[in-house]
Every structure is written in structure tokens, then in C-alpha cells.
Design a protein with these regions (language model features):
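Beta-loop-alpha module in the N-terminal Rossmann-like domain of NAD(P)-dependent dehydrogenases
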Residues: 1-34, 38-52
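Rossmann-fold dehydrogenase core element
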Residues: 48-65, 84-91
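Predominantly a Rossmann-like dinucleotide-binding segment in NAD(P)-dependent oxidoreductases
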Residues: 66-145
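Short glycine/proline- and charge-enriched loop/turn segments
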Residues: 30, 102-109, 206-211
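A short helix->loop->beta-strand "cap" motif at the edges of active sites that frequently abuts
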Residues: 29-31, 55-59, 162
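Hydrophobic residues in well-ordered beta-strands that form the structural core
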Residues: 35-36, 60-62, 189
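C-terminal glycine/acidic-rich active-site capping loop/insertion
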Residues: 179-221
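Contiguous beta-strand/loop segments that form the cofactor/metal-binding neighborhood of enzyme cores
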Residues: 123-196
Length: 221
């Protein structure tokens, strides 16, 4: 099997509830780990995984591929040139309900919007602020029948009084975007978290009562 094979890295695409077990097994076999998001479903689980990777001198990367799309490099450039002092981040990611038999609705397998969807705008806010949160205040709407969260709203406080506002859900009109509000301008994305390799996307700069569109050519992230 993969654990015993002559490999340098193992990609773990199992349900979230199984990530801890197999990430640790991979690390203990001396293999680097590429683990699907969310890498785990609890803080304690994350600590166990990181400890195992450190003890076995291997690396782990959470597979949030959107980070490698070139639009985000361009966004950072625009922030430095046009927005100046960043104040707030607003991230939205949601879509209509998946089928009832979809793994996202299975709480025993790590389902729920917080694990499956909220991780995207949360990750984006950390990339934009280039810092880690100080505190989080959130509310989750649960599907009582399935015992999983179907929508999440959160306010995340970062150092230097920066704040990220996050909304995500399984019961929404499709949206995949974020905006950054700065002292001199605002920037918004057209499609932030799921851009197909053959699709172009756009960034919109709001400044001096004008909106400028910056097109980003297709890219394989």
C-alpha cells in the first residue's frame, strides 16, 4: 500500500474524520503529507498531526489550491500600491444545498460547512493580513435532522485592529469572492476560491469613485 511504498509524499483525500489517522501514519512512515482541506476537525487533532510530522522530520501542507492562483499575487501587489493601510476583509463562499447523500452532510465523516467551506475565506483572510487571528466570534446554523452546520458567520480579530468578516453556507445562491477595504481604496474578486484552469477571472479596484477591472488570464493552480 501507499504507506509502505517507496514514495516521498502521500496525498490524503479521505473524509475529514480520517485525516488525523492517515496523516500520522504517513508521517511515521517518513513521507511528506499533502492533506485535503480541512486538514482536521479539531485543534487537538491538529496538534497531534503537527507533532508527528515534526518528530518524523516531514512536512505537511493543507490542500487549499486556490492560494496558488496568480490572481492572489496580483491582489497583494494592488493592495501595496493602491489600498495602502488595510482595514477589513470580507469573505463569502456558499452554494445551493448538495444532495442529501453527499458526504458534506455526514457529521461522522467531518461534514458541515465550517470544515468544508468556511476554511476558504478564513485562509484568504490570513493570507491578506499576513498574520494569525487573535480571537473569533461566530454563529452556526445547524440542520437538526442531519446534525451538521449548514451556514456560518464569523468575525475574526487580527493584530493591529484588523478584522475579517466571513459568511459561508450550503443553502445559498452561489458566491465565491472576497473584498479588502483599505484606507485609500477597495478591491473585490469575481471568483476567488474555485476558478477552473480554462477560465479567466477579474479583480475590481474601487478608487476615486471609479471601478477598474483587472483581468486575470486562465491558470492551472
Amino acid at each position: 500500500d501507499a504507506i509502505n511504498a517507496d514514495l516521498d509524499l502521500i496525498y490524503i483525500s479521505l473524509p475529514i474524520s480520517m485525516h488525523e489517522e492517515w496523516s500520522i501514519k504517513a508521517a511515521e512512515s517518513g513521507k511528506h503529507v499533502l492533506c485535503e482541506k480541512s486538514s482536521t476537525d479539531s485543534f487537538n487533532s491538529a496538534k497531534k498531526i503537527l507533532k508527528s510530522c515534526k518528530n518524523n522530520n516531514v512536512r505537511i501542507l493543507e490542500a487549499l489550491a486556490f492560494r496558488f492562483h496568480p490572481q492572489h499575487t496580483k491582489i497583494k501587489q494592488i493592495i501595496n500600491d493602491e489600498l495602502k493601510e488595510i482595514q477589513n476583509f470580507y469573505g463569502i463562499f456558499g452554494f445551493p444545498p448538495p444532495p442529501q447523500n453527499d458526504i458534506r452532510w455526514n457529521n461522522k465523516l467531518g461534514g458541515g460547512v465550517l470544515n468544508d467551506v468556511s476554511c476558504y475565506p478564513i485562509c484568504a483572510s490570513r493570507l491578506i493580513f499576513q498574520n494569525e487571528p487573535i480571537s473569533v466570534s461566530s454563529n452556526l446554523e445547524f440542520d437538526k435532522k442531519l446534525s451538521v452546520d449548514k451556514s456560518t458567520n464569523a468575525s475574526i480579530l487580527f493584530p493591529n485592529d484588523k478584522t475579517a468578516f466571513i459568511s459561508s453556507g450550503f443553502n445559498n445562491y452561489y458566491q465565491s469572492k472576497y473584498s479588502v477595504w483599505g484606507s485609500d481604496a477597495k478591491i473585490t474578486t469575481k471568483r476567488a476560491y474555485s476558478v477552473s484552469r480554462d477560465s479567466e477571472t477579474s479583480i475590481f479596484l474601487h478608487k476615486n469613485d471609479e471601478i477598474s477591472e483587472i483581468k486575470i488570464t486562465p491558470a492551472d493552480q
